[in-house]
Amino acid sequence: MAKADTKTKSSTSTQKRTTKAKKDPDAPKRPLSAYMFFSQDQRERVKNANPEAGFGEVGRLLGAKWKEMSEAEKKPYNDMANRDKARAEAEKAAYNKRR
């Protein structure tokens, strides 16, 4: 039995590529989440406790630790995230006024 012709044209070869807009270096930084503040705070401790763990494994350990935490334990990180969100919104408003 002969195989059917499976050759198809790639849609990417016929479509025009769009260029990604360059990011303004003066644009304000996005706010960090509570988990990201936790991750920054705990990453070295987790790496020291698990020296054989790679980058992905450390991330999984941090995620598991974050899920185990109570809301009271997460509160300092949530407060940091709220402050950072307010900072980012203020910087964005000032940035948009300049533009």
Swiss-Prot record:
SUPFAM superfamilies: HMG-box
Primary localization: nucleus
CDD domains to which the protein is assigned, alphabetical: HMG-box_NHP6-like
Entry's localization field: Nucleus; Chromosome
A GO MF label: DNA binding
SMART domains: HMG
Pfam family membership, one: HMG_box
Keyword DNA repair: yes
Region described as Disordered: spans on this chain: 1-32, 71-99
A GO cellular component annotation in the UniProt record: chromosome
Function (record text): DNA-binding protein that induces severe bending of DNA. Required for DNA-binding by the FACT complex, a general chromatin factor that acts to reorganize nucleosomes. The FACT complex is involved in multiple processes that require DNA as a template such as mRNA elongation, DNA replication and DNA repair. Also augments the fidelity of transcription by RNA polymerase III independently of any role in the FACT complex.
Quaternary structure and interacting proteins, as annotated: Weakly associates with the stable SPT16-POB3 heterodimer to form the FACT complex.
Descriptive protein name: Non-histone chromosomal protein 6
Source organism of the structure: Mycosarcoma maydis (Corn smut fungus)
Gene label: NHP6
